[in-house]
From Swiss-Prot:
GO molecular function (one): protein-lysine N-methyltransferase activity
Name of the protein this chain belongs to: Ribosomal protein L11 methyltransferase
Primary role: Methylates ribosomal protein L11.
Main location: cytoplasm
Cellular component terms (Gene Ontology): cytoplasm
HAMAP family the record matches: Methyltr_PrmA
Enzyme class: transferase
Name of a matching Pfam family: PrmA
Species whose genome carries this gene: Helicobacter pylori (strain HPAG1)
Name of the coding gene: prmA
Reactions listed under catalytic activity: L-lysyl-[protein] + 3 S-adenosyl-L-methionine = N(6),N(6),N(6)-trimethyl-L-lysyl-[protein] + 3 S-adenosyl-L-homocysteine + 3 H(+)
This enzyme's EC code(s): 2.1.1.-
Domain of life (superkingdom): Bacteria
Amino acid sequence: MLKPMYYEFFFIFPKERELFESFLLDTTHLALEESSLENLKAFDDKETIEFISQSSWHYFATHDPLKEHLKEKPQHLKNFVILRSQKDLNNSLILALEAFCLNLKQNLQSEFDFFYLSRNLASKDWLEAYKQAILPVQCAKFYIHPSWHQKPSHISTDDCIMIDPALAFGSGHHESTSMCLELLSDLDLKRKNALDVGCGSGILSIALKKQGVSALVACDTDSLAVEETLKNFSLNQIPLLAQDKVIYGSTQKIEGRFDIIVANLVADVVKSLYSEFVRLCNHTLILSGILETHLNSVLQIYYNGFEILEQRQRNEWVALKLLKKQPIN
């Protein structure tokens, strides 16, 4: 009997990677995995390392590519995005990305390239290999682990978050998520009310509940994210109380004010939500998912309403802990 197949896509986006990642999520509704050759080596995935390193990468550019700049293999293999699907998206997805590049060129008046590889493998083999590759990670006080890894006996259940990365939008391995968890670990949130904007897998909402918040609202504009959040609350045996809500939609549906707001988004969305965060935030705002190249434009917008308490950076990703400025009477 033939094993079912799945399709694996590797992408490198030299410019505006977060815009392309958002486009992939919106277009395919599939979770993305960001990785690097270093991470794959840690997973001992020799077959994938060999495939990525030795294959001739295809590319698309919105300008006539210069041979000295666009080689068969891109030189910047530090980061790439992996997408896996049970359907062959090769033709439709590449055409959609090409159209997106052209649209970005027109709107942003800049040139855009992307590199890609694809392959297909047996589903059963991949699922087992993937489970072996995903390891638990410690993010400050929080121990993040998939359901097929048992927590160590010396770690308290209160500090453990169970997330299955194959199904999730955020698993603690990405810099932006881990920095959010680190910033949350330092806060006393007992009897506080909290808002998680762009909840994704629900990992930050679960962390907020474990930190003792008395009321939680989580929202996301992706219905799949709402389903994942609810699923992961159940996986972690955290009941949603009467005052807790998981909402499909953005902040416009939310009333009241919150002691703490967390938003692990992309820079453009963070900038667009400034007035909403001014309306909703009563004290602390944690922002993440901001690439270093967009940091100054974010700070320029948030300067009038918030004070910077802490800034963290890991690789090219930045997270901010902000304090709401109170009006002077």
